[in-house]
């Protein structure tokens, strides 16, 4: 006799008198087990889906790998690294890396007549991959980022726009503190919404040249390099 058949018979009949258990009781027990398993499967699927969504958004904002100055870890202001064409080419030659882009950041503050909010201005160049942010763009368009022509257009999150009472096309005043206070007026070209508050409440996306000028850096100096996606990389 197989083990499964033995267990089934023990469940179906009482061990003392061989009296058959009522069919409704068996059906109720089976239904309870089925519902319990279904709830467990759904819960696991939701958790896996949530983890995957969070992972994709973290990578979309930050990338799989970032190369930055070690001093930037313990400092409010970012410290640059020198990234020339040769370094970009060398990184792009790795078959495991599908995309490489430069970026620079500058912490600052948005101020309106009614409110102010801390933020980080992230600048990207012409090699910027717009696919992630385009997926979550709810208004406007993504500016064209170029090495030769600088722009003061910026992408802002819907959460920040709502909090600061801003809309598409508005001029916003941003302030930055280093040796002295610097102010820049930016134009809202697009509004995105990822519903990932850790990033939506923090990042504004703009031109790499603009951020480099705010930092007082040379053209080949940037905060870092990020690989937006890769299949496998052995360090």
Locate each region found by the language model.
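Alpha-helical transmembrane segments
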Residues: 36-47
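Short beta-strand-to-loop capping motifs
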Residues: 69, 227-230
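Conserved small/polar residues in nucleotide/adenosyl-binding loops
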Residues: 231-235
């Amino acid at each position: 006799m197989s083990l499964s058949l033995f267990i089934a018979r023990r469940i179906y009949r009482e061990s003392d008198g061989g009296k058959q258990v009522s069919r409704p009781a068996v059906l109720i027990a089976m239904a309870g087990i089925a519902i319990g398993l279904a709830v467990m499967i759904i819960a696991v699927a939701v958790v896996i889906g949530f983890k995957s969504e969070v992972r994709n958004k973290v990578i979309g904002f930050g990338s799989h790998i970032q190369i930055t100055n070690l001093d930037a870890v313990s400092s409010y202001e970012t410290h640059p690294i020198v990234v020339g064409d040769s370094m970009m080419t060398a990184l792009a030659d790795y078959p495991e890396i599908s995309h490489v882009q430069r970026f620079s950041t500058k912490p600052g503050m948005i101020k309106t007549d009614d409110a102010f909010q801390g933020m980080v201005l992230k600048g990207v160049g012409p090699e910027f991959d717009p696919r992630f942010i385009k997926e979550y763009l709810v208004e406007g368009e993504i500016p064209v980022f170029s090495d030769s022509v600088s722009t003061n257009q910026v992408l802002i999150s819907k959460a920040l726009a709502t909090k600061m009472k801003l809309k598409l096309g508005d001029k916003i005043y941003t302030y930055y503190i280093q040796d002295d206070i610097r102010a820049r007026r930016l134009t809202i070209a697009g509004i995105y919404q990822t519903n990932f508050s850790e990033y939506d409440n923090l990042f504004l996306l703009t031109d790499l040249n603009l951020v480099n000028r705010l930092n007082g850096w040379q053209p080949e100096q940037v905060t870092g390099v990020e690989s937006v996606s890769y299949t496998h990389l052995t360090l």
